[in-house]
Amino acid sequence: MTFRTTAVTAFAAAALLTPVLLGPAAANATPSTGVSAVTLAHTDIPAGLLPFIPQGAHVEVREITIAPGGTTGWHYHDAQIYGLVRQGTLTHPGADCKPVVYRAGQIIEEPGGKANTHEGTNLGTVPVILDVLYVMPPGKPLSEDADAPACAQP
């Protein structure tokens, strides 16, 4: 199975679980502003249960809302994640500070690792709403705070 097939399968399995409300993640290096998140579903896949995830995984689906003028702050993920922009326009610069713009209906694929530090910003007038699928290594957080890259320093 491909990772994409695995992710879709995990998304479907996680979507069947009971919703749990979580608050916004705290950021230390470059704090988020105007961001809230609701966990729609989550589960843990034990090591050895699925051959395509031999180490196991924490699977979580979250609805993330970024208010107009809000930002996630600079961060990265320890594994590739997938998102769907349900509403609004997300400006998404990476470590090279070149913004990529995602509009409603578009899919975001974010590679994992510190080298893929990025931020999400809402420069529009309506909230950005994202549905994000995380398939994370056991014990890893959904995101890791990061310093803004040199190109983003004022």
Each language-model region and where it sits:
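A short beta-loop-beta micro-motif enriched in histidine and acidic residues
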Residues: 54-57, 70-84
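Ligand-binding loop in jelly-roll beta-barrel domains
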Residues: 98, 113-140
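Glycine- and acidic-residue-biased ligand/ion/polar-headgroup-sensing regions
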Residues: 77-97, 106-107
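Short acidic-glycine-tyrosine-enriched beta hairpin
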Residues: 66-67, 94-115
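Short histidine-centered beta-strand/loop micro-motifs
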Residues: 72-77, 94, 101, 119-122
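Extended, low-polarity transmembrane helix blocks
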Residues: 29, 126-130, 136-137, 141-154
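A short, N-terminal "cap"/entry segment at the start of jelly-roll beta-barrel domains
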Residues: 2-11, 15-58, 146-154
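Extracytoplasmic
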Residues: 56-61, 125-128
